[in-house]
Amino acid sequence: MYIKPWITLGGLAAVLGLGGCQTLSNTTEKVSDQVTGLFSSKDKAPKIDKDGVVDISKKTLEQLEKFTASMPTQQWVYIENEQLGRYQLKNKAQDGVILTLALHCKISSQRPTFSLSSAEGKPLLKAYDPNAGQIQFLLDNQNYGNPFNVHTDEPLKRFQAAIAQAKVIKIFNASRLYTFQNGNADLLSKPVSCQESGASG
C-alpha cells in the first residue's frame, strides 16, 4: 500500500482491495504510529521504509478493516497490492465516505472510473451506472458535469487536467453533495487498476 498518504474496502473488498502498500508525505511519522497501533504485540506491525511504503498484503481482513478505519482523511492514498495485481487511489472524507478514483489505467483495455462507498463499505455511486441519474463533478466549485462518458473522452481529458490543480472535489448526485479535499493530488497521475471494458460498474 502506498500512502503519500492513501487506501480501500467494499465491505473492504470495495474499499481496500485486500492488501497493499501505502506512501506518506508530511504525515509519515504520524501515520506510521497509527499503523503500529493497529496491531498487537503478538502480531507485529509492518515497517514503513524510507520511501514511505508499507506492505500489508499478508494481514488479516480484520487488520485491514482497522487500517481503513484509521486511514488519513482529506487526502489521496495509493494502495498497492502486488499479490492481487491491484492498484487503487482512495480519498476519505471527514464523514467517512470514500472516493475511489481511477484516471490513468495500467491496462489500456480498461477504462477510467470512480466509485463512492460509505464508511461501512456500502456502495453509494459508481461510474457508468444507467440508474444513477445525473452526476456532477465540481472542482473548486467549477462544474465539469460527468466526465465519465461512454461516448467521448473529451470531458475526461478536461477533468484530468483540472483536477491536478484543484483544492476541493465535490460530487453531486440525487440531492446529495459529497466533498473531498484534494490533498496529495500528485498521486492522481499514478496508473491504477481501472474498470474492465464492458463492465457496468
Residue ranges and their predicted role:
Residues 127-132:
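Short coil-to-beta strand junction motifs in C2/discoidin
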Residues 32-125:
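An ectodomain-focused feature that recognizes extracytoplasmic/extracellular
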